[in-house]
């Protein structure tokens, strides 16, 4: 048994192994040195305690970097209760370190779907009763949806939601359009210092790492198909290209497709003439029969469907770095094909039928992380320096919404404030400046004459909201 001690009498947590806390703490200390923006905000605002009185329910990947985020929120005055937004993404040593610090956390790597939902419930409840939470920090929207559907009374005290991902933002906007969203939300995903860092540069770093850890394959000289060319797709295509892969891209958006062409990628379709007829006859079998690796990056459903999976080259690697496991039709694979676990989060999917299989069969696909996020299932996700920008945005977004005190507004004012919006650009620039300083960079200041000439202040913001970085 470990010598690790939690605060006396503290048992408000469930992790895989509390004895991993010392290891986790060592990694947290290293991560802090690689997160200058987040730590800069901690130093800047700690005396002010801008989150004093905030009670935050958090549901985001329980990694080492998230531990730094959690402890920053606490340092600024908040109370938190935490779970992971993915059954495979928790780093158990990180969860243990947070529990050992006396912070309620419910997360471990390899949760079942039922355990995943149970963990979220434990953050919503305290001592079996709904916690008097007033803020939500979410990744993907599951926590937000559960609160709206099962605990609507809690929303009367909640000032708002800060959402990390494209998928979660889509769900928020859908709820807003249908009149179902009851609290305002900050779209952290579309802050420049999140979308460009996390979605693009983070995936560039972590996709190839995860594939190599999962398969031990040499990637160079092989053919890859990247589904989607948004920021995640751009980073993913670069990640595979720098490994020496021959990368093709498929897109539905002509602007993103044009960008892929300009970046030197061949834009193709897995469907004849680009039209998904829903039949095997409509599949571009010549293309898919040559693909060694396929990765989904879209946040959309069934972008790698059953007919595509049937047509893929034998022994092709299939993975997802978008968000949920429904980007790949894993439901079809579970129903019709046999699964053989090679090691945790690596399966051979035998296309010879369900039930028993011949271990020597060579007609299989290699599925990573069961179709969930490959970079967190098969590796440790984005590095600390990447997550620095994302999580600094989360802190500023939490402060921003908490100060607005939505739950205390009269009904008429609430109707005006019920929006899904991005952080003000000035705050985005604040995060970027701290990141540049962390790299040892020096930003040049405009002269008053230059600022007047382009119609901005010397302190910024420097670009209009519509500017595309």
Swiss-Prot record:
NAD(+) binds at residues 165-167, 199, 228-233, 251, 300, 321-323, 375. It catalyses: S-adenosyl-L-homocysteine + H2O = L-homocysteine + adenosine. It is found in: Cytoplasm. Belongs to the adenosylhomocysteinase family. The lineage of its organism: Bacteria, Pseudomonadati, Pseudomonadota, Gammaproteobacteria, Pseudomonadales. SMART domains: AdoHcyase, AdoHcyase_NAD. This is Adenosylhomocysteinase. Its cofactor is NAD(+).
